[in-house]
Amino acid sequence: LMDVHAPQSEREILVNGWFGRGMPDLNQKNRHLARYLIQNSIWWIEYSRIDGIRQDTHPYADYDFMATWCKEVENEYPDFNIVGEAWYPRGTASAWWQRDSKMNESNSNLKTVMDFDLTFTCQKAFGDACSSREGFEAGLFKIYEVIAQDFLFPDPNNVLVFLDNHDLGRFMQKGESDLRRYKQAIAFLLTTRGIPQIYYGTEILMSGTKAEGDGIIRTDFPG
């Protein structure tokens, strides 16, 4: 949506097209449906007493509706947090989606976005940090280059930071025996800016790659 070169036809496909063959879209431009979805969300928050929601594939929904949805939910629950999955390999695009972004002509009202740029960088950087490679193209310097762009985010402290999740291969790969990389990465995750997310199983070194399938990286926690 932020691409100034994108034709209107592609924008409509992104927002109005089905996400998958078994995932039909709801017409969130319909005011009756929009009101139902907002009220239904508020009801479930009240009923379940949850503290936050991760909104999957946030950019694929109707922008104006999602901005209204975020605002009305926050009006009801000021301390509630909404995390939008805006999956972009560069932080510049993720920053566009955060609330009060100077790059966005309108306001998304989305408090927290996911920092996929830092995730992918960590997966590479900590591997380099345990090797003999040196220089400005290896190791932790890659991470420095990412967080040096934090001026793009309206609020870097409300960015979700993570090493892996249910859509990615686990940070601890199968057969890996070097715990130094793992410990260093966890230490960074828990001390850098933003809100740390730890995927279940990380604490017991669960492993698995995306190539093995989602069923492997989403294996039940043992016990």
Where are these regions (language model features)?
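Acidic/polar loop patches that form or flank catalytic/metal-binding clefts of enzymes
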Residues: 84, 195-202
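Conserved interdomain hinge at the start of the Helicase C-terminal
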Residues: 182-184
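Aromatic- and acidic-residue-enriched carbohydrate-binding clefts of CAZyme catalytic domains
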Residues: 1-28, 218
